[in-house]
Amino acid sequence: YAKEKGMEICRQKYGKFVCDILDYIVKGGHPNLFLHDNGLLYSNGKERVISWMNAVVDGRPVNPRSGYLVEFNGLWYNGLRFAAALFAEDSEMASKVEQWNEIADKTAESFVHTFLNDYGYLVDYVDGAMSDWSVRPNMLIALSLDYSPLDKRQRKRALEVVTRELLTPKGIRTLSPKSYGYNPTYVGSQTEREYAYHQGPARPWLMGAYADAYLK
């Protein structure tokens, strides 16, 4: 909306809403988004689904993604920088803008340290000492946004991994064939399909994020 109508109109229409969302998270209002001192958002997903990878069997998540989720924190960083840009010309919001930029600086440094591995792609989530190195499309969110904690070289290298391991003519795989648990066949009983749902079958909608990342 800001790109189409301009920042001024966007600020007039949605500025308070954007500010309220960030304040809600920063002040600890959300029951499952915890802002840590390192600038990253932590969420508990061990017992319930918290992301779009929401397959459930017997009331428990098939993919219990928990801790620092890569797409949550990519979106968090983007939101902070966008809000700071949205209110950059508003002198009454100078202290808020400074606060958001300070948090975003921490987020960016921690994001790279936490998610970017030696192979050039982003791990899917990190919870304490456990890092999920599965190659999944959630990293595309962080690669596709206007404000990214990664520099252009880092984004390009990560996208090359996505292209090599996840891109298909029909969409983006939900898991790389090289990653543990890969199962591209969505057939069988409801339970069998739930177990396979995010373990390899391609999703056409993820091509949007891929295209945005590619163009950047």
Where are the regions that the model predicts?
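Well-ordered alpha-helical scaffold segments within catalytic/enzyme domains
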Residues: 1-9, 74-94, 141-152, 208-216
